[in-house]
A protein has these predicted regions:
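N-terminal auxiliary segments of SAM/dcSAM-dependent transferases
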Residues: 7-123
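A short glycine-rich, Lys/Arg-flanked "PGG" loop and its adjoining helix->strand segment in the class I
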Residues: 243-255
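Conserved SAM/SAH cofactor-binding pocket of Class I
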Residues: 136-222, 226
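Class I S-adenosylmethionine-dependent transferase superfamily signal
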Residues: 22, 153, 246
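Hydrophobic beta-strand segment of the Class I
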Residues: 230-231
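Active-site capping/gating segments
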Residues: 261-299
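Conserved short alpha-helix immediately C-terminal to the canonical SAM/SAH-binding motif I
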Residues: 193-197, 238, 265
Length: 299
C-alpha cells in the first residue's frame, strides 16, 4: 500500500485547530512536530512554529480528503498563520519510519529527558530518562501543555505517590511520573491505538509492574481508588465533562493537573473546577493553558 503524507507549517497558536482539521481526514492520528532548537550547553528548546503531519492511504477517497483539508486550511488561514498543504506519496515500508526523522531527544524541566527509542543518549547522573516509540499517531512531549504537565509533575510527584493519568496517549506522563518516584501509576485512554502505544512504551521502559494501562477514561481506573496526583492532558470540553469524576479521584490534599486547554474555554474550566473546591494556579504558554489544582481536604 502507498500513503499520502499531508503536512503544514503553522504558528503555535494554530496547532490545535489545524490538528483538528487533519484528524477529520486521517483516522490513524496526527503528528505535531514543534521546532526543536539545540543549545550550545546541552539545552533543548521548542521554537515558535510546528509542523502538523498526517498520513492517509492512497485510495479512491484520497483526492476528496485532500480537497477537504485544503479547504479547511484556507478558512483557518483567515485567522492564523497557516502554511500551504504539502502532499507527497510514501511507500508502505517508508511510512513506518518516515516520521522518525522529525524527532530529537530533548530536556524538560531540570531532570526529565525525553528520548525517542531509536536515538542514543548518555544521561547525566540526575537525569530521569523517558524512552518513547510514539508511533506515527502520538507525540513525544513537544506540545506546550504536555511540556508544562511534565514540568509540573517534576514539582509535585513525590517518592511513593500513586498517580492517575487520564488520556495517556503515548504514556509519556505516566512514564515520567514513575521515573520521578511514583510507586504506582494507572493510565487510561479511550483510543485503543493509544493504549497499545502506551503499553509498548511501558514495556520498553521495563515498568510493567508499576504502570497499568487501561482502555477507557477516568472510570476505568479501579473503583474506589484515589490518587496523590491526577493528571489529564486532554481538551477543555472533556475536562469540564469529567471534572467531578477527576476531582473525586484526588486524595485529600492531593494534586490535580489538567492541560490541553486553549485560552478561550480556560475560564469555563477554572469555574467548574473552582465550583468543585479546587484551588487553582494557572500557567500560560502562548495560547495554551495548564492548571495546577490543590484540594484542601474538605471534598
Amino acid at each position: 500500500m502507498r500513503w499520502l503524507e499531508f503536512a503544514s507549517r503553522v504558528d503555535g497558536e494554530a496547532v490545535e485547530a489545524v490538528s483538528e482539521a487533519f484528524s477529520r481526514v486521517a483516522s490513524g492520528g496526527v503528528v505535531v512536530e514543534p521546532d526543536v532548537v539545540t543549545g550550545a550547553d546541552d539545552g533543548f528548546t521548542v521554537g515558535a512554529q510546528a509542523t502538523v503531519r498526517a498520513y492517509v492511504p492512497v485510495d479512491d477517497r484520497a483526492p476528496e480528503k485532500q480537497s477537504a483539508l485544503e479547504q479547511a486550511l484556507w478558512h483557518l488561514r483567515t485567522i492564523w498563520p497557516v502554511g500551504e498543504l504539502s502532499v507527497r506519496e510514501v511507500d508502505e515500508q517508508d511510512w513506518a519510519n518516515v516520521w522518525k526523522k522529525h524527532y530529537a531527544t530533548f530536556r524538560v524541566g531540570h531532570r526529565l529527558v525525553i528520548r525517542p527509542s531509536w536515538l542514543e543518549y548518555s544521561p547525566s547522573p540526575n537525569d530521569v530518562v523517558v524512552t518513547l516509540d510514539p508511533g506515527a499517531a502520538f507525540g513525544t512531549g513537544l506540545h506546550p501543555t504536555t511540556r508544562r504537565c511534565l514540568e509540573l509533575l517534576e514539582v509535585v510527584v513525590r517518592p511513593g505517590d500513586e498517580v492517575l493519568d487520564v488520556g495517556t496517549g503515548s504514556g509519556i506522563l505516566a512514564l515520567a511520573a514513575r521515573g520521578l518516584g511514583a510507586a504506582r501509576v494507572v493510565a487510561t485512554d479511550v483510543d485503543l491505538l493509544a493504549v497499545d502505544a502506551a503499553r509498548e512504551n511501558v514495556a520498553f521502559n521495563q515498568v510493567d509492574r508499576q504502570i497499568t494501562v487501561l482502555h477507557g477514561s477516568v472510570d476505568s481506573a479501579p473503583a474506589g481508588d484515589s490518587y496523590d496526583v491526577v493528571v489529564a492532558n486532554i481538551i477543555a470540553r472533556v475536562i469540564i465533562e469529567l471534572a467531578p469524576r477527576l476531582v473525586a479521584r484526588v486524595r485529600p490534599r492531593g494534586v490535580l493537573v489538567v492541560g490541553g486547554i486553549i485560552a478561550d474555554p480556560a475560564d469555563a474550566v477554572a469555574n467548574e473546577l473552582g465550583r468543585l473546591g479546587v484551588v487553582l494556579q494557572r500557567y500560560v504558554d502562548g495560547d495554551w493553558i495548564t492548571f495546577l489544582g490543590y484540594l484542601d481536604g474538605t471534598n
